[in-house]
Amino acid sequence: MARYLGPKCRLSRREKTDLQLKSGIRAIDSKCNIERIPGMHWQRRGRTTDYGVQLRMKQMIKRYYDVLEKQFANYYKQADRLKGSTGDNLLKLLESRLDNVVYRMGFSATRAEARQLISHKAILVNGEVVNIPSYQVKPGDIIEVRSRAKGQLRIKGALELAQQRAPISWIEVDTKKMTGTFKEQPDVAELPAEFKVNLVVELYSK
């Protein structure tokens, strides 16, 4: 499946929550009514089945991390093989993607922008260029904006926007040096309360 290139607002409206797909310069509800799902007859939608609820949750999490269907399925398989809760493992794997970590550290305004920075070799991991957005960051890894990219206005702007977001316990960032440390495995308790990942587990367990 190709990556969605349409209006980001439409995806947030579909899931009835802010998926953080836009830069955050303006509040999402300033032009995007997330309470109204896309379509002309949105008020006539019928009762959702259990399968429909499970599918919607999978779509919400998949779109939040901006990954493709096949990628998401592979993450689930990997999470299911690991010890512990499959649902928690799934969220930890998604949170540990390099594009997500770059976004969390505030070096980009969106995950899509983070992927672009990584693909353009503007990000270092432990001093080495990594241009794979899906690269799994490990505890102790140091993420840094490459020297030649530190003057980019979009990165400086993203760092300013990041100050408005709630801090994340598993990362530590030096905004002046544009470096950050992935201190430990993500704490799923700090992720959006809307994520009922048990529904995704139920969906894939069928």
Swiss-Prot record:
NCBIfam families: PRK05327.1 (NF003717), rpsD_bact (TIGR01017). It comes from Coxiella burnetii (strain CbuK_Q154) (Coxiella burnetii (strain Q154)). One of the primary rRNA binding proteins, it binds directly to 16S rRNA where it nucleates assembly of the body of the 30S subunit. With S5 and S12 plays an important role in translational accuracy. The gene is rpsD. InterPro entries: Ribosomal_uS4 (IPR022801), Ribosomal_uS4_bac-type (IPR005709), Ribosomal_uS4_CS (IPR018079), Ribosomal_uS4_N (IPR001912), S4_RNA-bd (IPR002942), S4_RNA-bd_sf (IPR036986). It comes from the Bacteria. Transmembrane segments: none annotated. Part of the 30S ribosomal subunit. Contacts protein S5. The interaction surface between S4 and S5 is involved in control of translational fidelity. GO terms for molecular function: rRNA binding; structural constituent of ribosome. Keywords: Ribonucleoprotein, Ribosomal protein, RNA-binding, rRNA-binding. This is Small ribosomal subunit protein uS4. GO terms for biological process: ribosomal small subunit biogenesis; translation. GO terms for cellular component: small ribosomal subunit. Belongs to the universal ribosomal protein uS4 family. SMART domains: Ribosomal_S4, S4. Residues 96-158 form the S4 RNA-binding domain.
